[in-house]
């Protein structure tokens, strides 16, 4: 599955458009609370544990989006956008969402 932020793929022609596909991942209250409380390992102003959790959530969201595209018959997703949003009561959760357009390229 080809996944790209661009609206097209160089050297490939979009044959079919299937519509918008999405994927989401939500990090629970304990992870977000720990991250913002500074309990994680901060090295040089960056939190390695936080970055790892964000990477995990991003990969889950992208994988879910790809699976949804494959179910539609697509072999690529173009125009991908990844968003991060704090949700829940008092910002207790972090949601990572990925969205794009499912297409078939040849």
From Swiss-Prot:
InterPro entries: UPF0145_dom_sf, UPF0145_YbjQ-like. It comes from the Bacteria. Coiled coil: none annotated. It holds the Pfam family YbjQ_1. Signal peptide: none annotated. NCBIfam families: PRK02877.1. Belongs to the UPF0145 family. HAMAP family: UPF0145. This is UPF0145 protein DSY2697. It comes from Desulfitobacterium hafniense (strain Y51). The lineage of its organism: Bacteria, Bacillati, Bacillota, Clostridia, Eubacteriales.
């Amino acid at each position: 599955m080809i996944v790209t932020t661009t609206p097209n793929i160089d050297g490939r022609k979009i044959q079919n458009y299937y519509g918008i596909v999405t994927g989401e991942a939500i990090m629970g209250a304990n992870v977000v609370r720990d991250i913002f409380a500074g309990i994680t390992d901060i090295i040089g102003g960056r939190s390695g544990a936080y970055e790892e959790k964000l990477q995990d959530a991003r990969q889950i969201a992208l994988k879910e989006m790809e699976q949804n595209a494959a179910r539609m018959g697509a072999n690529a997703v173009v125009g991908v956008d990844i968003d991060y949003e704090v949700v829940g009561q008092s910002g207790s959760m972090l949601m990572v969402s990925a969205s794009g357009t499912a297409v078939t390229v040849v």
